[in-house]
């Protein structure tokens, strides 16, 4: 950059900005790619990130994928790098911080695991906040010229780190867990000679000389999410010391749960193999319990006993035990837990999270990781949104074109990255087996009659127009609907559903059903075949055609012994027997509930104002690109009432469960899925599990804090504001 004069750079920047402006502004991806070479990109970054740089500015660099691997801010006047600035930007390999930097926000460079080499923090740097560089595993050197305060987990899991150099004579404030997840015996700490003793005794820095583990205190009343039905702590009784524990005892039917218990002992406690006698962790099947998911958990100095009617119930007891081991979250290993007794069972039958690999593909291994995390909070269903306008993501052997042509595209709104990928049936069978180890069922979703552009792209005869259409590159609602008068539609759906039923053993298949055009179902009004079908059947309205389509598909699912699910819309005038509807639209939950009660149907609650976890958790939070999304705060999610004010008869006869949705128009990395989900998913889990009398938002904030600390320690993204 030094080889050009300031004037020539300014002229080049002016020409570039003018070109962008004439080509639809900053969101014109082709403009970015045509006019921004590396040098101009650097200058553009400096222009964009001036004194008033904000999250939206950084989003332009993070998510609008100019194919740059270097972020050089050495010429920038930027003083504040905000929270999440380049969150999970895996393409970055090099970072140079601005010379007048004041602060780096929470998770600003979280999981930027490509950044390598040395990072220099100028003397002006006042703060590096929580998890700012957590997971930057290729960083090797850190150099601080000033007295920079270093927040919790700021450099956790930077496992490639080999040298940390500081100029400050007085040790800067540093969280004791700032460098968690690193073997500090391999890291050289270089400080002024006269300050070595001070650093040796200073929190955070002392860990470079010898590990100082704070004792993990377990206070059960201030732990546990979801909150159990009954909890008694016996403070006058002797606690269980993990160093005394011998091992795990369980019948053959609980072999999977025994492995989970052994994992908890190995990862979460100071237990060591080798003792011959002492306390045991005992897992017991107890058929006297009346609820299949009910468990009891007893702890005393003689050991741990978890009883459940089923293996699932015992597993939930183990997830509670694991949270007890996390304790107050200051250490990765538990020394002891107090004597206690827990009696627990869920309020609702299904606690579900939905992920959307269509808009942004989710790699297979990342789906597995998400299952492990959601199971910690006793979620028991992963809802996979496999089909939409933007892609078809599941192999259908009868129609290989669906993934050959329908799983690849370039772009999602203003994010121009190449997005491709699909799941084979063998992968999904493996996922089902993996999820079963965590007592999570996998529910597949296709779409009809709308959100089917990818299918119509592959098979134009599915639509009324019978014309080829491109895969959609934007969010929103398309008028390309499946044609209810087309015989091939039913042949196609029969074959797709038959294959899905064979791959996914869960008793449910989700059929979509939402947002079928603008106006809803309007595309059928101009279709001669649909008009003829109306006349033949004596119909006068398009909603009757939708009923006709769904009746046939639902009958097919019933023949496959599957329960149909779909998103409730007002165009559904009746709900077919044996179906499950989802209340999702803002302001229409009561309407959906009334329809479910009237039709004796089951209902899942996922109203957007509480359960749309892809919405930002607070104003200005990710995703900063906002096409009308409201904020869904942690408190809003927590305050979801699954009964929606209805009586106990509704809870008994109609309420099936709760669901949190993670639509991925703006979620373009696995880390961002976790960030959007947690801790709101934990709040939703408590809404679906715990009875109202045991719920308190204020107390939840206390109870969830150790769990979010634990996630950061493990390098899992979580919204910690």
Where are these regions (language model features)?
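Flexible, acidic glycine-rich loops studded with aromatic residues
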Residues: 564-569, 574-721
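Feature activates predominantly on carbohydrate-active enzymes
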Residues: 290-491, 495-508, 524, 552, ...
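Bacterial Sec-dependent N-terminal signal peptides
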Residues: 1-57, 218
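Acidic, contiguous N-terminal accessory segments
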Residues: 179, 215-349, 560-571, 705-721
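Structural signature of tandem-repeat unit edges
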Residues: 65-80, 90-103, 113-127, 137-149, ...
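Active-site neighborhood of glycoside hydrolase catalytic domains
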Residues: 480-577, 587
